[in-house]
Amino acid sequence: MKQPSALSALVEALRALPGVGPKSAQRMAYHLMQHDRDGAEKLGRSLLFATEHLQHCEKCNTFTEAQICEVCLDEERDPTLLCVVETPADQIMLEQTMTYRGLYFVLMGRLSPLDGIGPKEIHFDRLVRRASDGVVKEVVLATNFTNEGEATAHYLGQTLKARGLAVTRLARGVPVGGELEYVDAGTIARAMLDRRSM
């Protein structure tokens, strides 16, 4: 039996979400239509509202409803520090630690030549202009510790160092509360190499 075209369109739309394959999308679509139509309508309204009202901050490139986000407008932040992250979600995680009081630049991705993502797609020129504004003294590279994140950090670091900026990278190591027997060998090796005196 062929499913209705409206349902097929919903399944296809849900597949656009990261990590959602055809089966998961179909389960979600059927759940929304069978058990949670109010939730489906709320989801639809929220998606429409977000697409109509969210834009990228002119300074840091994160999502905002205004031209400039609240973080960039906060005069109590240290404008000499610029932390580079891959996504707005990464920025939020750093903010939740309440340990960083500088400004941000959100790449909206990471270098991945195999996927067609180069410097242009991660707003590299905007980052260089922002970091070279004469105010920024240190750039903290907080890209993820994946192969692509490491390649992105290396590329950005080389370019920004050549412009006379101090470039630092987040430390890596054993997570807080982590037990060595459950940590992978690469993480333990990096923690050993990055050890510091007490």
Curated annotation (Swiss-Prot):
GO biological process: DNA recombination; DNA repair
Residue ranges covered by zinc fingers (C4-type): 57-72
Signal peptide: none
Alphabetical keyword list: DNA damage, DNA recombination, DNA repair, Metal-binding, Zinc, Zinc-finger
Domain Toprim, residue spans: 80-175
Record-level Gene Ontology MF annotations: DNA binding; zinc ion binding
Positions in coiled-coil regions: none
Gene3D superfamilies: 3.40.1360.10, 6.10.250.240, RecR Domain 1 (1.10.8.420)
Family: Belongs to the RecR family.
HAMAP family: RecR
Name listed for the protein in its UniProt record: Recombination protein RecR
Species whose genome carries this gene: Paraburkholderia xenovorans (strain LB400)
Gene for this chain: recR
